[in-house]
């Protein structure tokens, strides 16, 4: 219910060390005609008028910027508190909504001011006071948690994050800080339990320690990624130079609140010096990451890049020139999210914010080198807040779900949907009050047997295509799947099979409806009957339950043999395997022992058609490529000299001492006539 980023507490070290300079100097020489220094001069340089921020100023500015982003994107939903630590912990604000604003925090920080350098070095000045107060603040409930308790919520989750900005000497001091924080956390949870019951227990805490040092100073504290100290505490450590603390917190906040960065490019703005000309500027904004994931969908991704000087990715979108468009040109909105600029004080950001707050809207498009423009987002303001709207550039969210007929291989419109519905009704199972006897119940047996053979589309079956044209076929198929077929049913099926054989002998066509009023050739008619017999045999094989089924199967196989479509019985299980693997309309498979002239003619005809049409199989292409490559290389001499069936021996004289002592370049006469032996 309450996430970890619901509560965030900044603990700022207000000791004497934070009064020193950050060693980043800013030139104050604004006189015209004087060039700016090319490099930042060192401390004590006499070039121009310069100033430098203290470590305390860098820490306060960056932490306030952190909470500004949080309150802009999550107004009233996420809470940030500040605690200043020196000789004691000073609470800057509380969880109350009246203190969760920029004005209150800024005024309080002005009253704290920079630590004095005249403060004597003492152990009373420590950041530990602030960390203790931060743990106590995490145990205090927010207004939302109090409301959840009032409505009777038994378990209220209470997690939080503590960001401590301090400076430590080495890893040992940092380890001591972690141990003290973990100990105080356990003590605080012990206090809230019975019988004290003070506040909420802390389920988990994420401690982020930022070790701040001046520019150019090397720290003995090493960086460390997220590490689990205890089931209640995770700690990560970052050593940062004081001028870079804002960039580090900006990078951290994107992970803390699942944010994403978008850079709006090519924003036309009037120049201050020349109102008649304009230049293009870029503005970086932050928003929830879902603004990018929702707009893309599973089949589209936005291009990202790493902005110079930063370590996070940003999505680049172009400013789209406003133009008149109708409702049909607008994409549906799939989500809206609050937006805040990264650099709120820059002139381009200020111009964009004022432009939006004045009631204007901005369309953003995905930059493309070629093709049409794709508008993916829209910026607009309502009620003093700026939102980014995610526009659907994939399949519209308001469109109906994709039809079952829209397959990857093209539109398929001949699914046997009514037959599938009947199969589902026949296979429907309901729970029984008593457990049936035997290994398999009757319902489970039926459920396993019925869908063994079910063509999904009409273009892969001949048998089920003829049900409407042959009046006897539906009843015939019903008798085939009966488990209790009797002798009378067998006789009826035998009669229908013999009638079908007589029609094939006379050369009658099968009554297909899509013959386009043209009589098929005799060879095509035979192929249709042959496929019909094969599919019928496959159906009977999968439903053999009684002796009558077996007699019917043997009768059909004898008819297939008489018709020239013999099944090879020398291969065990070959017919049963084909019943599962072969499609009724698959190409004719010839058996090795078949002597049918019609089968041979079909095979020769298919070969002629393939050779005449120029079609080649994958094996032919691979073999041809291998032969062409092999012809360019000389074969191994030993293989050429070795008789067929034997293996050539590599280095036949290797290890022969008599041959090793021969003079180099002299070949004995007895070796000239010997060939390489295997």
Curated annotation (Swiss-Prot):
GO CC terms, sorted: cytoplasm; INTAC complex; integrator complex; nucleus; perinuclear region of cytoplasm
Compartments reported by the entry: Nucleus; Cytoplasm; Cytoplasm, Perinuclear region
Source taxon at top rank: Eukaryota
PTM comment: Phosphorylated.
Bias kind Low complexity: ranges: 593-604
Gene Ontology BP annotations: cell division; centrosome localization; dorsal appendage formation; flagellated sperm motility; meiotic cell cycle; oocyte nucleus localization involved in oocyte dorsal/ventral axis specification; posterior mRNA localization involved in anterior/posterior axis specification; regulation of fertilization
Tagged with keyword Cytoplasm: yes
Cited Pfam families: Mat89Bb
Region span, Disordered: 570-626, 652-678
Stretches that traverse the bilayer: none
InterPro entries for the chain: Cell_cycle_regulator_Mat89Bb
Keywords: Cell cycle, Cell division, Coiled coil, Cytoplasm, Developmental protein, Differentiation, Meiosis, Mitosis, Nucleus, Phosphoprotein, Spermatogenesis
Intervals of motif Nuclear localization signal (NLS): 603-609
Function statement: Component of the integrator complex, a multiprotein complex that terminates RNA polymerase II (Pol II) transcription in the promoter-proximal region of genes. The integrator complex provides a quality checkpoint during transcription elongation by driving premature transcription termination of transcripts that are unfavorably configured for transcriptional elongation: the complex terminates transcription by (1) catalyzing dephosphorylation of the C-terminal domain (CTD) of Pol II subunit Polr2A/Rbp1 and Spt5, and (2) degrading the exiting nascent RNA transcript via endonuclease activity.
PANTHER family documented for this protein: INTEGRATOR COMPLEX SUBUNIT 13, SARCOMA ANTIGEN NY-SAR-95-RELATED
Similarity-based family: Belongs to the Integrator subunit 13 family.
Subunit comment: Belongs to the multiprotein complex Integrator, at least composed of IntS1, IntS2, IntS3, IntS4, omd/IntS5, IntS6, defl/IntS7, IntS8, IntS9, IntS10, IntS11, IntS12, asun/IntS13, IntS14 and IntS15. The core complex associates with protein phosphatase 2A subunits mts/PP2A and Pp2A-29B, to form the Integrator-PP2A (INTAC) complex.
UniProt-recorded name of the protein: Protein asunder
Native organism: Drosophila grimshawi
Source organism phylogeny: Eukaryota, Metazoa, Ecdysozoa, Arthropoda, Hexapoda
């Amino acid at each position: 219910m309450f996430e970890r980023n619901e509560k965030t507490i900044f603990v700022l070290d207000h000791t004497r060390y934070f009064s020193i300079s950050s060693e980043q100097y800013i030139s104050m020489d604004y006189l015209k005609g004087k060039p700016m220094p090319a490099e930042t001069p060192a401390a004590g340089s006499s070039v121009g008028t310069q100033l430098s921020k203290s470590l305390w100023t860098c820490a306060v500015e960056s932490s306030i910027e952190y909470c500004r982003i949080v309150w802009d994107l999550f107004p009233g939903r996420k809470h940030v508190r500040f605690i200043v630590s020196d000789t004691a912990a000073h609470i800057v604000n509380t969880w109350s909504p009246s203190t969760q604003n920029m004005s209150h925090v800024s005024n309080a920080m002005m009253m704290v001011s920079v630590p004095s350098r005249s403060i004597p070095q003492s152990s009373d000045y420590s950041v530990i006071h602030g960390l203790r107060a931060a743990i106590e603040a995490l145990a205090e409930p927010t207004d939302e948690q109090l409301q959840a308790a009032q409505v009777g919520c038994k378990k209220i989750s209470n997690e939080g994050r503590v960001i401590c900005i301090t400076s430590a000497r080495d890893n040992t001091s940092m380890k001591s800080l972690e141990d003290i924080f973990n100990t105080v956390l356990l003590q605080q949870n012990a206090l809230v339990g019975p019988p004290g019951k003070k506040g909420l227990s802390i389920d988990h805490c994420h401690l982020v320690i930022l070790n701040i040092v001046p520019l150019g100073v090397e720290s003995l504290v090493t960086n460390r990624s997220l590490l689990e100290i205890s089931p209640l505490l995770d700690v990560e450590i970052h050593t940062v130079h004081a001028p870079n603390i804002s960039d580090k917190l900006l990078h951290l906040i994107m992970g803390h609140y699942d944010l994403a960065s978008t850079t709006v490019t090519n924003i036309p703005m009037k120049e201050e010096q020349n109102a008649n000309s304009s230049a293009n500027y870029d503005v970086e904004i932050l928003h929830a990451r879902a603004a990018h994931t929702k707009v893309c969908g599973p089949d589209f991704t936005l291009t990202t890049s790493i902005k110079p000087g930063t370590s996070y990715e940003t999505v680049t979108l172009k400013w789209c020139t406003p133009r008149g468009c109708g409702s049909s040109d607008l994409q549906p909105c799939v989500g809206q999210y609050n937006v805040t600029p990264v650099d709120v004080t820059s002139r381009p950001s200020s111009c964009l914010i004022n432009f939006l707050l004045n009631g204007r809207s901005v369309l953003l498009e995905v930059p493309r080198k070629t093709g049409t423009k794709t508008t993916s987002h829209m910026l607009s303001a309502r009620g003093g807040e700026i939102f980014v709207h995610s526009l659907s550039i994939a399949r519209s969210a308001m469109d109906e779900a994709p039809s079952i007929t829209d397959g990857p291989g093209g539109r398929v419109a001949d699914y046997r949907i009514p037959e599938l519905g009947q199969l589902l009704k026949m296979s429907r199972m309901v729970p029984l009050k008593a457990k049936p006897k035997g290994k398999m119940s009757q319902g489970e047996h039926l459920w396993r047997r019925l869908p063994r053979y079910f063509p999904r589309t009409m273009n892969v079956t001949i048998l089920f295509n003829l049900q409407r044209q042959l009046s006897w076929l539906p009843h015939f198929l019903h008798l085939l799947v009966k488990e209790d077929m009797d002798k009378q049913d067998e006789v009826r099926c035998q009669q229908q099979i013999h009638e079908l054989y007589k029609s094939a002998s006379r050369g009658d066509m099968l009554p297909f409806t899509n013959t386009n009023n043209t009589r098929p050739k005799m060879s095509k008619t035979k192929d249709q009957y042959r496929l019909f017999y094969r599919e019928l045999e496959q159906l009977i094989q999968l439903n053999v339950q009684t002796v009558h089924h077996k007699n019917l199967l043997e009768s059909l196989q004898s008819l297939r043999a008489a018709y020239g479509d013999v099944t090879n019985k020398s291969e065990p299980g070959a017919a049963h395997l084909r019943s599962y693997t072969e499609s009724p309309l698959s190409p004719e498979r010839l058996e090795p022992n078949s002597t049918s002239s019609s089968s041979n003619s079909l095979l020769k005809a298919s070969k002629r058609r393939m050779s005449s049409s120029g079609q080649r199989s994958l094996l032919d292409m691979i073999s041809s490529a291998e032969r062409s490559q092999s012809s360019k290389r000389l074969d191994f001499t030993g293989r050429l000299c070795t008789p067929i069936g034997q293996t050539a021996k590599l280095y036949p004289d290797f290890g022969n001492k008599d041959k090793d002592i021969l003079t180099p370049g002299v070949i004995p006469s007895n070796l000239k006539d010997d060939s390489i032996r295997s």
